[in-house]
């Protein structure tokens, strides 16, 4: 029965469902988990790497799942990366055009809304398919300070304190975040919580920098700083967190 209604994005099923959008969301669940946590002094983004081939030259790419849109906003993705690249380039262009016109950074929510308008358009017109990617946006502006947003293939978006996208165990990730998040969480505590979430959701032992990506977004004085952990930094952080956990357990 569903096959009668899933050939085009412009057709609703009798139950009010748009199957092509649901299929796009299924593609996201097959991707590695990505976590975003809003702290009082910044934002943490962390992700599970799916590409772990030994012959892959990782030096040709800074990050597999995290991208800088502008000086004041970055994003992490889960889903089809080639779809994400199109939207990221569009977001960069939109942000640059806004700055050229108004001589100030584009408000984070306005930028997210503009990207999501494009995503929503791909669910309404014939001959197109939805973007099979979900985003976490981390940004700062003078209007609302630090902000974390999530968007999905339907074009819907919302602000979050902590959330996760992708991964087969997304419900586990959300449960861990709900149980451990607190409003006054610091950046360091948010990094540790992100590691805890990914450790719970990943089906792998020996967690290390080959399987994870970590970054944080904060302010130093008047400057917005975005830092992606190097492999050495991430391995050191994982080791330090494990030692602290062992000390607490003892």
Curated annotation (Swiss-Prot):
SUPFAM superfamilies: N-terminal nucleophile aminohydrolases (Ntn hydrolases). GO terms for biological process: proteasomal protein catabolic process; proteasome-mediated ubiquitin-dependent protein catabolic process. CDD domains: proteasome_alpha_type_4. The keyword Cytoplasm applies. It comes from the Eukaryota. GO terms for cellular component: cytoplasm; cytosol; nucleus; proteasome core complex, alpha-subunit complex. Belongs to the peptidase T1A family. This is Proteasome subunit alpha type-4. It comes from Dictyostelium discoideum.
């Amino acid at each position: 029965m569903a096959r009668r209604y899933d050939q085009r994005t412009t057709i609703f099923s009798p139950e009010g469902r748009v199957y092509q959008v649901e299929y796009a969301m299924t593609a996201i669940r097959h991707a590695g988990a990505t976590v975003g946590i809003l702290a009082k002094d910044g934002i943490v983004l962390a992700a599970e790497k799916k590409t772990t081939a030994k012959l892959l030259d990782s030096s040709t790419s800074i990050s597999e799942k995290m991208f800088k849109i502008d000086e004041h906003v970055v994003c992490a993705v889960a889903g089809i990366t080639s779809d994400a690249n199109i939207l990221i380039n569009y977001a960069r262009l939109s942000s640059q055009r806004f700055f050229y016109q108004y001589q100030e950074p584009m408000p984070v929510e306005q930028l997210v809304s503009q990207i999501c308008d494009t995503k929503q358009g791909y669910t309404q017109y014939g001959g197109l398919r939805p973007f099979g990617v979900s985003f976490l946006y981390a940004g700062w502006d003078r209007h609302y300070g630090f902000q974390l947003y999530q968007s999905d293939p339907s074009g819907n978006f919302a602000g979050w304190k902590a959330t996760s996208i992708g991964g087969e165990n997304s419900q586990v990730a959300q449960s861990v975040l709900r149980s451990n998040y607190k409003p006054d969480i610091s950046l360091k505590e948010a990094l540790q919580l992100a590691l805890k979430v990914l450790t719970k959701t990943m089906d792998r032992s020996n967690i290390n920098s080959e399987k994870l990506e970590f970054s944080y977004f904060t302010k130093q004085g008047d400057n917005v700083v975005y830092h992606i952990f190097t492999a050495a930094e991430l391995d050191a952080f994982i080791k330090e967190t494990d030692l602290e956990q062992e000390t607490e357990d003892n």
